[in-house]
A protein has these predicted regions:
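Juxtamembrane helix-loop boundary signature in multi-pass membrane transporters
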Residues: 1-7, 99-159, 163, 169, ...
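Alpha-helical transmembrane segments of compact multi-pass small-molecule transporters, enriched
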Residues: 39-44, 96-110, 125, 187-191, ...
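Hydrophobic/aromatic residues within the transmembrane alpha-helices of Major Facilitator Superfamily
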Residues: 11, 15, 42, 71, ...
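Alpha-helical transmembrane segments
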Residues: 69-70, 116, 120-126, 176-188
Length: 289
């Protein structure tokens, strides 16, 4: 089931990115981060109450790890990703994001001595190659300074995300995923709000929630990208090897290219078709492992 959860994560995140792009002309990256994370926290709480999931017996050590994971993986990494997206655009961001799967392989080996098979490495090579082929389109208007900071922020975002989710994998094995998600995103949300208050004052926080919750595209993106995909994402890491989950998650970049044709009126070029085919073959190879 872990592989299915990881694949569904890619599908949900792809929908979310399209919706976030449609909403991005209304709010800045920090505002989008706060709205989507608050939506996720509310969704997790409502689901826990409806399903009557009992509070797990987290140790103090577990709570500290979850809090640090939330601060790094949600509070910092998400902000770095959105800042990178703003500086270098979606095309280059997609290529920088290919560092995610190799980061998971390395960190999973360091944390858990998890060995990745040859099949997974081969599938990863094809999928990442497909992403580069289908998304590469260097924007001429980007300065060298923007390129450097955008790539740096993007790479750090992927590495921090990988480290933060793997740090809570042992906790997820014996505890409900929804509580893990709630604590991580609760800490990330509080961190982002505090940052906004220090940077721009209380008034912008209220404006952010007022405008954000009236933006139907942002709410849709939050539902798919923060509520559904986070639950599926954590479930994928709970029920399968970290390396397999990571490479299935990486397919979201290719799915975004397909969805952009229908929702954003992008053109499905030969280059994109080749990239999609390479990624599909790579996913099949990983699934046969």
């Amino acid at each position: 089931m872990g592989d299915i959860y990881a694949l569904l994560t890619a599908v949900c995140w792809s929908f979310a990115v399209i919706l976030f792009e449609l909403s991005s002309n209304k709010l800045n990256p920090l505002q989008i981060n706060i709205v989507k994370n608050s939506f996720g926290v509310i969704g997790f709480v409502i689901t826990i109450l409806i399903l009557d999931i009992p509070y797990p017996n987290f140790s103090n050590k577990n709570l500290v790890i979850l809090a640090i994971s939330g601060f790094i993986g949600v509070g910092i990494a998400d902000l770095f990703f959105l800042e990178s997206l703003k500086k270098i655009g979606s095309s280059l961001s997609a290529i920088v994001a290919t560092i995610y799967a190799p980061s998971v392989f390395i960190i999973a080996y360091i944390f858990f001595n998890e060995i990745t098979s040859l099949n997974v490495y081969l599938g990863t090579f094809l999928i990442l190659g497909g992403i580069v082929v289908s998304t590469y389109n260097f924007p001429k208007q980007i300065t060298s300074s923007q390129l450097f900071t955008g790539v740096l922020f993007g790479a750090l975002a992927q590495i921090l995300t990988a480290a933060s989710v793997l740090s809570v994998k042992p906790i997820m094995l014996d505890n409900p995923i929804l509580y893990v998600a709630l604590i991580r995103f609760g800490v990330g949300l509080i961190s982002a709000i505090i940052f906004m208050i220090f940077k721009s004052g209380y008034s912008l926080v209220f404006i952010t929630f007022e405008r954000g919750y009236r933006n139907i595209f942002l709410l849709g993106g939050s539902f798919f990208g923060t509520y559904l995909s986070v639950i599926l994402w954590l479930a994928g890491y709970k029920y399968t090897l970290a390396g397999r989950a990571a490479i299935y998650n990486q397919l979201s970049t290719v799915l975004i290219s397909i969805m952009a044709v229908y929702f954003l009126k992008d053109t499905l070029t030969i280059k994109k078709k080749i990239g999609i085919l390479l990624s599909f073959i790579g996913a099949v190879i990983v699934s046969l492992d």
